[in-house]
Amino acid sequence: MIAHGISGTIKWTLDDKGTLLFEPVDGKEGTFEKSKVLEFSDDWKGYEWNKYSKSIKEIKSTGKINLAENASYMFYGCSSLISLKGLKDWNTNNAIDLSSMFDCCFHLVNLDDLKDWDTSNVKDMSNLFHFNQSLRNLHSLKNWNTQNVVNMNSMFSDCSSLTNLAGLKDWNTDNVLTMNFVFYNCSSLTNLDGIKKWDTSNVRSMSFMFSGCSSLTNLSGLKDWNTSNVVDMFYMFYHCSSLASIEELKDWDTSHVTTMEAMFGSCLSLTNLNGFQNWNIDKVIDRSSVFRNCLDVVLFS
């Protein structure tokens, strides 16, 4: 045994094989204590097993397990974790904050054991699957209820093996306010058709949202997005080096956008700017760098 302890009314043990076992103290039902992580603080107050994150290879559980309202950073940095089978029957209907829960779980190949999670009360999903670089698709999340989510920042950023977003096509994003870095450096994505029905009418910020998606060849999946309340679009498509055209975005409402710095910067294949002339950029503070490193900026001065 490497370590053991108690979280709320759940006892846990981590054995020499890397198996993290959770079971209720009374053998029947238990609830985790809420996360104590203070973001941007040097005073780390995560779960006790976070100290051994690199040794955790699989998770198992027995009895009825209830997730706390705040489960942020619960398995942060479990870079050797390959199985989530112990989580499939967890009661998650009280969860509000799942931020960074599986952040930097490099070797997770699928999320099948999370497919039945009740996420109807979750508000914060930021960094939830950040740097899950072995994930190839998100089909397991297709039934997640995201109706109350407000923050999706960096949710799938650096998921470099993701090839499509079909699993997200029915997500309810009505209440999301921030989508910064959501798909940042998802370098294997070739299209965005899976999110074409997303309601983005309340989103305020989309900075770096698709930056580094170097395999994207078109933006047709975004043509019907409502961007009427977006203020920040800086670096949104930066280094989408396979994009040849932005014509699909011709009907975007950019009347409230104030920052577009390097929005299409380093889009080295971009040759067709048809559609950009339709945009209202009256409130944009600096227009000179929108197409930095890809076209003559004099056109937009």
Description of each model-found segment:
Residues 1-301:
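Negatively charged
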